[in-house]
């Protein structure tokens, strides 16, 4: 579950303050799908960056699966992001020199998954998307 309470994010540009998020509160239940829509500059990316632990709010509280993640260190944020958060960027890139299988396997290696399990997971993903020959 994601719970945001009074999340505010302000960017400073010279003497000006741009309030990208102003006291945002929301709850997203486990398994729930949410669409975030709005015009350019309305704070969508900032909100997703806070939820994805890629950015910090200036104030407010953020809970993920019941744990307060508001003030975690960078290393703790990276660990939680790796274990709990799935994030697909609008412009994402594969490693061009790697095969589809190697691109799928890379995060599993970083996660420390054993070779037999990696082979199994990579094969299942390739089959699911008909990518065996890529």
Residue ranges and their predicted role:
Residues 52:
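Helix-to-loop junction immediately C-terminal to a conserved catalytic motif
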Residues 37-39:
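The feature captures the beta-strand-to-loop junction immediately N-terminal to the Walker
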Residues 98-107:
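Short coil-to-helix segment of the ABC ATPase nucleotide-binding domain corresponding to the Q-loop/switch region
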Residues 67-68, 109-112, 116-134:
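Conserved ABC ATPase "signature" region
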Residues 15-18, 69-86:
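ABC ATPase NBD coupling module
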Residues 61-63, 67:
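ATP-binding/catalytic-site motifs of ATP-hydrolyzing domains
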Residues 34-35, 87:
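Short beta-strand immediately N-terminal to the Walker A/P-loop
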Residues 1-4, 10-23:
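A short, flexible loop at the N-terminus of ABC-type nucleotide-binding domains that lies
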């Amino acid at each position: 579950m994601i719970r945001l309470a009074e999340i505010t994010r302000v960017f400073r540009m010279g003497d000006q303050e741009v309030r990208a998020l102003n006291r945002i509160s929301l709850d997203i239940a486990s398994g729930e799908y949410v669409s975030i829509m709005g015009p350019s500059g309305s704070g969508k990316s900032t909100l997703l960056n806070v939820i994805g632990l890629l950015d910090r709010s200036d104030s407010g509280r953020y809970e993920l699966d019941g744990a307060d993640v508001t003030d975690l260190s960078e290393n703790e944020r990276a660990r939680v992001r790796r274990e709990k958060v799935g994030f697909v960027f609008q412009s994402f890139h594969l490693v061009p020199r790697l095969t589809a299988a190697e691109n799928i396997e890379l995060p599993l290696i970083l996660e420390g998954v054993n070779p037999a399990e990696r082979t199994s997971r990579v094969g299942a993903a390739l089959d699911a998307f008909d990518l065996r020959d890529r």
